[in-house]
Structure formats: structure tokens, C-alpha cells
Amino acid sequence: MGERVGFGSRRSRAVHRLALSPACWGVNEDGGWGHQIDAERVLSEAVAVGEGAITAGPPGFLPDRSDQAKSLLRRQHVQVVAGQVHAILHHHAARGPELAHIDGHAHWLAAIGADTLVLSAIPERSPNAARPGPLSNAEWAHLLHLVGSVEHVCARHRLKLAVQPRFGSTIQGPEEIERLLVGSEAGVCLDIAHLVIAGADPVEVVELAAGRIQHVHLNDVDPDIARRVREGSLDYKEAIARGLYMPIGEGGAKVERVIDALRASAYSNWYTLEQETRLATSDDRPLGRISRSLEYVLPLLS
């Protein structure tokens, strides 16, 4: 495994452990998502707002070769703290290819200095696939067994595993989260907005998962748009274009309560500002929205 890369804002590491997600700049692997901003600009703007830590972004955002990615990160004085991988976990026939996919991404993440792999269980080989019906007991057994295998993969690469309950995935609502917690020992990624969209209470999830939370996605949503997405009357991708994600503190997710609950549970790992957005043109400037979220969040984390 490659060396850990330690750089970035001393304030971010020592005080509030806050990273920024490239998703805040509209970065997405979906080809029809919207205008894409290159990594150089994202990294430089992250540093400009005082945050020297990011998450890895989707495939292709950073160079596939770890030495090239590390060179870019060093040049911009940024560290990567976590990265996400989407995998099909409930099909026994997909076990080999999916584990190989996860292992390859884990190797790359460790080589560029990340410490956490965020795993989302997708229904199909697409991060934005529509969610099918509930899993059968046999599919749940396959999923939980494979989660255990992914834990071993992460341990081999000295990474923490954080399974993310995510709207549109095979693990999203309260019943599925409880089944994950009871049926495995895996860590959890708490994504406030995705929990709200799926109809879960993030504070209740913090209390249920307390010592299992390994990573946190901070975000806020328009409650009416979130309800329409949950009910199926509005597509998730279209909802983002209509303003589903709002600057933190301006939506209905009650982020301050969630952070208070995390603090009460002695959570001490990384937070990531993860506000998905879609940019129509190169003239769009997401930095203003990011700064508004930071103005609200930073005092809560200090």
C-alpha cells in the first residue's frame, strides 16, 4: 500500500475535521448531470474557503493513477479523507466482480491517503438507479455476508468501512438500517439529507447506531421537495435541479440537532459537507452556496 499523504489545513484536521465533497461543485459521474468543474478548480476553491480536506469524488475526478492523484493533491495542499464506492451486494452471482471492484477502489483510496471507504448498496450497476422492491430474506443474507467481506477488504488496506443508508439504494429507511445494524458489525455513514428523504429521523439513527458511525455527510433539504421525492412524484435528479439541497441551516433537516446528538455520542471522525447540485453552465458559481453552509456549520463544530 502507498504511503499516507498528510497535508491540508491544520485547522480542518485539529479542530473540526470538516471536509468538502466535490458534489458541492456539481461533480457527478452521471454523463447527463450538468456542467462539470475540473479537479484543479475544485481543489483550489476548497483551499480558498479554508478547508484543506476533501472526499475523493466519483471515478475520473482525480487521476486513476495514485501517484498522479497524490501529485495533484500535494500541489494544491489538499488531503483526501474518504471516498465512496457503489456496489451490488444482494446478488450472490455478483460477489466476485463486486468484491474485486471494491478492493481496487480501496487500494487506490489508501494509496492517496484516505482513511474511510463509504459504501452504498445499489440495486444495479449505476449510482442513480431507481430502487426496486424490498429485498428477500435470501438477498439480505447475501448483502450482509458481503458487507462482512468488505470489512475484511477495508481492514487489509487499513481503511474504516462506513455503509451509507442512501435514498434509492437497497439500504435507506429505518427498517433496513436496523437490519444492517443487527445483522453486521459494519460502521455507518450518516447522511442527514438521504435519511430525511427516505423518511428516517437522523437523530434516532445517531442514537441507534451511536458507536458505529464512522463518517457523516452534512447537508440540508427543502422539506416539501424531499417529501415529493419520497412519495415518488418527483425524480431525485430533477429534484436537485429544483433546489432539493439548500444551504445548511436554511432547510428542514434540523442539522444542529443532529450535530448535538453526534457530540453527545462522542463522535470524533470526519464530517463532510455533501450538498449535491447540478450546474447548468460554466457561469454557475457554487462557491457562494458552499460558503453559506460553512458559515452555519463551522460554529457548530468548533
Task: State each model region's role.
Residues 17-19, 53-55, 77-84, 115-118, ...:
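Structural preference for beta-strand elements that scaffold enzyme active sites
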Residues 35, 53-68, 88-99, 167-172, ...:
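Acidic-and-aromatic substrate-binding clefts and catalytic sites of carbohydrate-active enzymes
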Residues 2-11, 92-189, 197, 268, ...:
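Active-site acidic/histidine proton-transfer and metal-coordination neighborhood
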Residues 283-302:
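C-terminal helical cap(s) of enzyme catalytic domains, especially alpha/beta-barrels
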Residues 9-15, 43-48, 62-82, 100-114, ...:
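Acidic (Asp/Glu)-rich catalytic clusters
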Residues 20, 46, 54, 73, ...:
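Conserved, mostly hydrophobic/aromatic
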Residues 10-38:
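Boundary/entry segment of secreted carbohydrate-active catalytic domains
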Residues 145-249:
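Acidic/histidine-rich catalytic cores of soluble enzymes
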